[in-house]
């Protein structure tokens, strides 16, 4: 059972359908006990960083998510959910994140002859050949975002180019993030969710 964090930000219906296709049962919940009992925690999200963090705080989930991740619970952040895993964001001011990954979230540059937000398909380049997410290499996934993670190279699994090098998958042991929407990325997106499923089943996050 995977628990999808319910904090009123993000389209969870398509994400649930993707896991259904992979024969992974899910529950949409903000109950700390259900999150703790799950095999993995999925943190979705669309919208603004500060509002999302406020929603997590309102539900008293910040400390819960931090404790679960630090106990070894697999955590997957998707789109804004990935950004929340980092230490801070400069979106509409300076805001603290969950601090589960090193780095901060910054605005995509608007002066590099690319459209902001990045909205559409982009081609991934694998940065960690031994990763379970190796099928992402040269494949296209679907993005919708105006901010991106600036983080250590040791956390980066894959990137795309959008004026700057944008981390598309990050991982630090059991904490993983995907900047793209796997549930909107067709077969390739399902492959990445399947890879995460296998990592959870094997309890093997040793690639980082």
UniProtKB/Swiss-Prot annotation:
Its EC number is 4.3.2.10, 3.5.1.2. Residues 1-206 form the Glutamine amidotransferase type-1 domain. GO terms for biological process: L-histidine biosynthetic process. The active site is at residues 79, 181, 183. Heterodimer of HisH and HisF. The keyword Translocase does not apply. It catalyses: 5-[(5-phospho-1-deoxy-D-ribulos-1-ylimino)methylamino]-1-(5-phospho-beta-D-ribosyl)imidazole-4-carboxamide + L-glutamine = D-erythro-1-(imidazol-4-yl)glycerol 3-phosphate + 5-amino-1-(5-phospho-beta-D-ribosyl)imidazole-4-carboxamide + L-glutamate + H(+); L-glutamine + H2O = L-glutamate + NH4(+). InterPro entries: Class_I_gatase-like (IPR029062), GATASE (IPR017926), Imidazole-glycPsynth_HisH (IPR010139). One of its GO terms (molecular function) is glutaminase activity. Pfam families: GATase (PF00117). It is found in: Cytoplasm. Its main location: cytoplasm. Keywords: Amino-acid biosynthesis, Cytoplasm, Glutamine amidotransferase, Histidine biosynthesis, Hydrolase, Lyase. Pathway: Amino-acid biosynthesis; L-histidine biosynthesis; L-histidine from 5-phospho-alpha-D-ribose 1-diphosphate: step 5/9. IGPS catalyzes the conversion of PRFAR and glutamine to IGP, AICAR and glutamate. The HisH subunit catalyzes the hydrolysis of glutamine to glutamate and ammonia as part of the synthesis of IGP and AICAR. The resulting ammonia molecule is channeled to the active site of HisF. One of its GO terms (cellular component) is cytoplasm. This is Imidazole glycerol phosphate synthase subunit HisH. The gene is hisH.
């Amino acid at each position: 059972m995977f628990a999808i964090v319910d904090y009123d930000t993000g389209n969870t219906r398509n994400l649930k359908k993707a896991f259904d296709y992979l024969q992974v049962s899910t529950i949409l919940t903000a109950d700390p006990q259900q999150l703790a009992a799950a095999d993995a925690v999925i943190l979705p999200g669309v919208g603004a960083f500060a509002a999302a963090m406020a929603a997590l705080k309102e539900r008293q989930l910040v400390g819960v998510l931090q404790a679960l991740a630090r106990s070894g619970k697999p955590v997957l952040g998707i789109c804004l959910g990935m950004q929340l895993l980092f230490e801070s964001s400069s979106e509409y001011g300076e805001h603290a994140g969950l601090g589960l990954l090193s780095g901060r979230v910054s605005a995509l540059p608007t002066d590099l002859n690319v459209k902001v937000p990045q909205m559409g398909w982009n081609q991934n380049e694998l940065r960690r050949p031994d990763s379970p997410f190796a099928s992402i290499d040269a494949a296209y996934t679907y993005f919708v975002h105006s901010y991106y993670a600036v983080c250590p190279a040791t956390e980066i699994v894959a990137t795309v180019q959008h004026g700057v090098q944008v981390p598309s998958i990050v991982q630090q042991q059991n904490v993983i993030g995907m900047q793209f929407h796997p549930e909107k990325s067709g077969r390739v997106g399902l492959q990445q969710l399947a890879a995460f499923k296998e990592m959870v089943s094997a309890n093997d996050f040793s690639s980082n």
